[in-house]
Amino acid sequence: MNLNSIPAFQDNYIWVLTNDEGRCVIVDPGEAAPVLKAIAAHKWMPEAIFLTHHHYDHVGGVKELLQHFPQMTVYGPAETQDKGATHLVGDGDTIRVLGEKFTLFATPGHTLGHVCYFSHPYLFCGDTLFSGGCGRLFEGTPSQMYQSLMKINSLPDDTLICSAHEYTLANIKFALSILPHDSFINEYYRKVKELRVKKQMTLPVILKNERKINLFLRTEDIDLINEINKETILQQPEARFAWLRSKKDTF
């Protein structure tokens, strides 16, 4: 399978996974126009759409795309039923698309019904995990989001994190505000800054590296714990996650 990305809105990525025959699955098409343009340019044959959650910038193009390609199957959690989903999916489900098996797992936090799609090495995680960060808690609790991130963190080292937004630079700036002397984060910041100056994307990222630069995946890391302890003593990783998320919300 081949991974492709289509920029949308100000900072969204619509991911498109294709096979050698040109059949494709489209992930979180927030708008239809750039997808239709890419389909025409590459002569792709859309087979399915994956929806991770119900927010407009992830589902806004679904109904128009279905008008052009009514044969497509649209997979999504229950919260996307009125957004164009034709087949509802949830935690533990498996589906077969493009001849490959995708495993679904629930990742509540950003929204209550958020799901991720995984077919090694590709993880389509919507707004749950970003490079260097995680989604805002619009509907879920810190505990839910922490558990969702731990599900992702348990995946193989070579998992490719296909997030839906280009937030990496801002997220790394936040990480450095907490751990300013972390050598790996500083090195990553320089690389990301160079990419963004050239208007190049920073995604996808490998989970093995993400574990080093994403503080939300490092809540049991001694350096981070020591830094948090300067302000407050928090015994549980979930509490440290909630502290970080609160700090990021006002950063």
From Swiss-Prot:
CDD domains according to UniProt: hydroxyacylglutathione_hydrolase_MBL-fold
InterPro entries the UniProt entry points to: Clx_II_MBL (IPR035680), Glyoxalase_II_hydrolase (IPR050110), HAGH_C (IPR032282), Hydroxyacylglutathione_Hdrlase (IPR017782), Metallo-B-lactamas (IPR001279), RibonucZ/Hydroxyglut_hydro (IPR036866)
Entry protein name: Hydroxyacylglutathione hydrolase
Catalytic activity: an S-(2-hydroxyacyl)glutathione + H2O = a 2-hydroxy carboxylate + glutathione + H(+)
Organism ancestry: Bacteria, Pseudomonadati, Pseudomonadota, Gammaproteobacteria, Enterobacterales
Source species: Salmonella typhi
Similarity comment: family membership: Belongs to the metallo-beta-lactamase superfamily. Glyoxalase II family.
Record: residues binding Zn(2+) 1: 53, 55, 110, 127
Family matches, as NCBIfam families: GSH_gloB, PRK10241.1
Record: residues binding Zn(2+) 2: 57-58, 127, 165
Keywords recorded for this protein, A-Z: Hydrolase, Metal-binding, Zinc
Cofactor note: Binds 2 Zn(2+) ions per subunit.
EC identifiers of the protein: 3.1.2.6
Subunit (UniProt): Monomer.
Gene Ontology MF terms in the entry: hydroxyacylglutathione hydrolase activity; metal ion binding
Pathway(s) annotated for this protein in UniProt: Secondary metabolite metabolism; methylglyoxal degradation; (R)-lactate from methylglyoxal: step 2/2
SMART domains the UniProt entry points to: Lactamase_B
UniProt-listed Gene3D superfamilies: Ribonuclease Z/Hydroxyacylglutathione hydrolase-like
Protein's GO biological process: methylglyoxal catabolic process to D-lactate via S-lactoyl-glutathione
Cofactor(s) annotated in UniProt: Zn(2+)
A Pfam short name: Lactamase_B
